[in-house]
Amino acid sequence: SSERESERWIASDFAFNTSGFVTAYKLKYTDTDPDFREEMNIAYTFNYNADGQMQKISMKVDGKDDEGSYSESGEINYTYNNKVLEKIEAKSKNITCSQTYEYTQAIKNTYNAMPLLLLPEALASDDCVFNVFAITGYLGNAGANLPTAMTIKNTDLEDPSENSTERYNLSYTLNENKAISSYTLSGYGETMTFPCDWTNF
């Protein structure tokens, strides 16, 4: 899928473990916009802990745009406490993005759901294939509880003016069977609600 007609995403070379969770795939992105052409190849590998929860994501990127060729790599690490997700930290070059979760009440994740707020922010916003894998259960077991707050901290060692910290309160609307119908982020005078319509996948 793409936001512009000039963009294309093609995923390939999928690998899975014995639990059915994805352990690797490749993603090719192309943008044929005449004002800024780009081609990018991303290779992902995924590691899980003994509880079947995502532990580490490794990425290698090779690309080419109007400014020339480039290569970079990065990794995303997950931290849990008693099967409850505490932190996701993504590192690439001199940039670190951490997502820290708070749990002020025990809201059980009854159906092992993985809404986008439990994914690394960069991948959730840029990689539609990753999102589909998460929503359909191919990225391992989710946290045992649903968080009630989230803090996103971006640190740029080369340009500290880009550093930022944002904190959001989280709430959920559950169906009669305790499945997530929607979730809401609130903070800084804004409230954003996102539906969880699993039938679209």
Where in this protein do the model-derived segments appear?
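Buried hydrophobic residues that stabilize the cores of well-folded domains
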Residues: 1-201
